[in-house]
Amino acid sequence: MAKFLLLYRADQSAAERMAQATPEQQAAGMQAWTAWFAKAGEAVVDGGAPTAGGDGTIGGYSILQADSADAVRSLLEGHPHTEIGTIDVLEILPPPGA
């Protein structure tokens, strides 16, 4: 099974979105993410975390495992981040010579 790095992109940084959200919006957002991770099940290798820095368009990451990038994209249907941005799916390759 291959591993895939997901990069969560949006026009506004994760820190800016969180700073502008009410506590209720933050709780609802976390509930949606928790529900998605539960649905993805054993495909989730690392739930990831928010990120900061760079050009601000990457707000976080996760690592999933699946048979193919298409299988990952299928898992991403209904992902809460797609309401505010896009998700890059990058296969993590073994180091050269490994």
Give the predicted meaning of each segment:
Residues M1-A98:
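Conserved, structured core segments of small domains
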